[in-house]
Amino acid sequence: LGASLFLCGASPVMATEVGDLTPDVRGNALQQDGRRVTCVISDKAGPIVGANVLVKGTTIGNISDMDGRVILDGVPDNAILVVSYIGYVTQEISLKNSQNNIKVKLAEDTQALDEVVVVGYGTQAKKDITGSVAVVSTEELKETPVATFSEALQGKASGVYISNSGGPSGETTIRIRGVGSLNGSDPLIVVDGVSNVDIDAVNPNDIESLQVLKDASATAIYGAQGANGVIIITTKQGTKSGRVRVSYDGYFGVAKMANSGYDLLNGWEAMEWQAQGMRNVRDYRGQTPTAHPQFGSLNDKDELTMPYAIKPAGLSKDQVISQFGSIDAWVASYKPDGSNSWSRSAYYQMLEDGYSEAEAQKGTNWYDMVTRTGKVQDHQISLLGGGEKGTYSASLGYTNREGTIISSFFKRYSLRANSTYNANKYFTIGQNSNIAVMEMGGERGRQGDASVFAQTYTIQPWVPVYNVGGDYAGSQASEGGRANTAYQTAMNQQDDWTRFMRLQSAAFAELNPIKGLSLRTQFSVRLMGMWSQALSEKTIATNKEGQSQNYLEENANWRLDYQWTNTATYKTKFNEDHDVTFMIGTEAMKFGVGRSMKAIRYDYIFENNPNTWILNNGSSDNMKN
């Protein structure tokens, strides 16, 4: 034996090095002053081999042998022993000073993941499974602090591909063994027997067990809806220990971009790149290069010159003074309607703002403008308890994540309550309920080169952030890239929001009239709602692409789904080596009972004040409903 492992509740795993052990020590990992305590660990079937016994608050511990026996040396007075084993309720035993020999009988807890797997509409011993099923332990899911279950599953199961949007909400795409043709290639998600659940509404801390059914033999019972694989989640239930356990789990942290952006040309380098292109046209083609709209033509030093003003073509400082009389007059001539919306180039604007020559030559770093270190936090309070007559569990969770792109965020509030009641040894009833409210903002669903991140490398670095009137620069600069700048796109979304509500509730009853026969019925409902609001600003005032009017868009929809599942299962065993399970069942579903509404109004006078973003405040001309 080279090392012994001890595990106690949420305590970390500890390893203790040991050398050669004499027979009278019987595998005890530590030798120190104090008394010797002998424990015998068993369950209703007999001794338990490999149970962990730890003296709470110390590194004194050991593992039970073939007889369920554990010997601990150096146990202090008034010690508390923590006895644990996978699949059983962890017990804490307070030792009296006179107690040197104790017996501990462990009670079975929830399904042990490595022994029993949830498949289809029941459970099965893992050794009896012939299909492809991946089991992910809750310990693995907790390894990384994440906001959603799908993020926690990444890299935990073979054959499961997960990609996300990169935003704080962690919107994901899950594929099991490739792409299918039904249900948009998405796998079927089953939570506590309820199908088609929104997994992002499931708090990862509420998960008790997780199985991924991957091949046809494992998913066949679900029919066509399981063609792309099935993910089965069982949430935490109460215990029959007779004790109440209250726990808190939380963390604070930060979210950062994995890299510092692309290695792009800065403002001065971009100008030199244009100059080299012109030289190549002249020297290798023998042609006169076309003047650049901003940098003009090559000067007598065979170089280009950074313009002072950009709109739509570049002007030097002397040209501005010649045309307007002075720089002050040029600034005073600014008009937000686009007829005279001038901007200084980023180089001159940064010099004006007090930056050094070296910094000004770099121009605008759009990546730095729109990225940040986001703050993240997650908190959960949970309650578990119960006894022989029933069990209960409840949890309250809160998640708040700032995205690494400014203005992006994700919040979730969740409440879960599960309970069972054993009326007698034949009849059990129970319920599993969960409600989650989520809010997210930023990105407006933009993809490709219209996204904030894509614009960090499509907008030229010589374009400034603001024009001389304080509005966003960009759309008036010829060859500046997209009309929108990355910063403008991000800031125009800072007051947008989308809110989701997900309510899932299931009630079940189970009758066991004779040995081996289980009759179960479960009725569940899922209520889903979505509300969103976004104001798109005008083209000129804030340089939005392709819009001459601002407009407010609001969306609202809700949907109610029903599911009724009935199963009869009979399990028997013969010749001690053969287990046979028969199951028949029916399932009725009704999806899509609900309504969706959308409205658009134009011409909001105070577009920068979200308090005025009310449909009735907009113009009814060309309105859309």
Task: Identify the function of each model-found stretch.
Residues A112, K127, K240-K362, T373, ...:
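Surface-exposed loop/interface segments of Gram-negative outer-membrane beta-barrel transport/assembly proteins
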